[in-house]
Design a protein with these regions (language model features):
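Anion-binding alpha/beta catalytic cores of soluble intermediary-metabolism enzymes, centered on
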Residues: 1-252, 257-319
Length: 319
């Protein structure tokens, strides 16, 4: 992944220049040649703190939205985007002092290839500007996310663990197809497991019925995609359990893309695997936006941030 990012190096914006993890991660990104960086915040404070941390940010550009020459232009653009919503130029200028909005406008204008945020900001604070400014791809109705879970013996894609709280069957099908495409982009051969508390026909209930309906929708929309469900996690990833619970399945026991039925399940599962099994969790990688914006967990480790920058840089290569 790092080699792919280096091969066609892109510029990524990090809006949270006040966070030590972000500064340390920025130093690693620059040292390893993963991406060029723009860091947002007060330049004097950021460079002073970097020196205290023994982090070399010489190669980074530091911009302060509060006094940037681009603020007025970004405010004028945002006013046009949101005029129908009652936006005023005064309010637009105020909004453009916000690092999340300013960073998103850098992406929108092609000044940077993508944005990584969320170490100190909520998911909503990171994602809302992207919805308003960058917007969704024409053929996508559901913006969702995946985590790339790097275990000791494999890499799995988990979706959706960050965006859609309680997806409908239709949204769940969108998430599955988008997640399979994202997985393939990063070298994972997609075999999609639609997770539930029931495997096959062993259980009933509204939750199982939703997953079953979503599985049928995926098969109709993308007939060439290997998908199965409803299926429990153990049957999805363990060949022995799969042989007992779902023999003959092209996915069971070999799943690489695991689709959770709701955000409660997905978010807690990725964190449990990350913290208890020592997996590296890269993401959430957002799917469906016109340009890449990726959200960090507020508990993100330094290497999580580095990896997410690499992911974002690779996504930017596609643009």
């Amino acid at each position: 992944m790092v080699e792919r990012a280096r091969a066609d190096r892109k510029r990524i914006v990090l809006p949270e220049g006040e966070d030590d993890r972000v500064l340390r991660a920025a130093g690693r990104v620059l040292r390893r040649g993963i991406a060029d960086l723009v860091i947002l915040g007060d330049e004097s404070d950021i460079r002073s703190r970097a020196a205290e941390l023994s982090v070399d940010l010489t190669a980074a550009v530091v911009l302060n939205p509060a006094n940037s020459d681009m603020r007025d232009e970004f405010a004028a653009q945002y006013l046009e985007m949101r005029r129908a919503k009652g936006m005023t130029i005064e309010r637009a200028q105020e909004i453009m002092a916000d690092v999340s909005y300013f960073g998103t406008m850098l992406v929108h204008n092609g000044i940077v290839g993508g944005m990584v945020s969320g170490a100190t900001h909520t998911t909503a604070h990171t994602v809302r500007p992207a919805f308003e400014i960058i917007r969704t791809q024409p053929d996508v109705s559901t913006v969702s996310s995946v985590f790339l879970m790097c275990l000791s013996d494999r890499v799995l894609a988990y979706g959706d663990c960050a965006i859609v709280p309680d997806p409908t069957a239709d949204q769940l099908a969108d998430i599955a197809i988008s997640s399979a495409r994202t997985a393939a982009k990063f070298g994972i051969d997609p075999r999609v497991a639609m997770l539930s508390y029931s495997t096959g026909d062993s259980g009933t209930g509204a939750g199982v019925d939703k997953v079953r309906a979503a599985t049928d929708l995926v098969r109709r929309r993308d007939p060439n995609l290997l998908v199965d469900g409803p299926i429990q996690y153990d049957a999805a990833v363990d060949p022995t359990v799969a042989g007992a619970k779902m023999p003959g399945s092209p996915v069971a026991g070999r799943a690489t893309v695991l689709i959770f039925p709701d955000l409660n399940t997905g978010n807690n599962t990725y964190k449990a695997v990350q913290r208890s099994a020592g997996a590296i969790a890269i993401g959430p990688v957002l799917q469906g936006l016109n340009k890449p914006v990726n959200d960090l967990s507020r508990g993100a480790l330094i290497e999580d941030i580095v990896n997410t920058v690499a992911i974002t840089a690779i996504q930017a290569q596609g643009n």
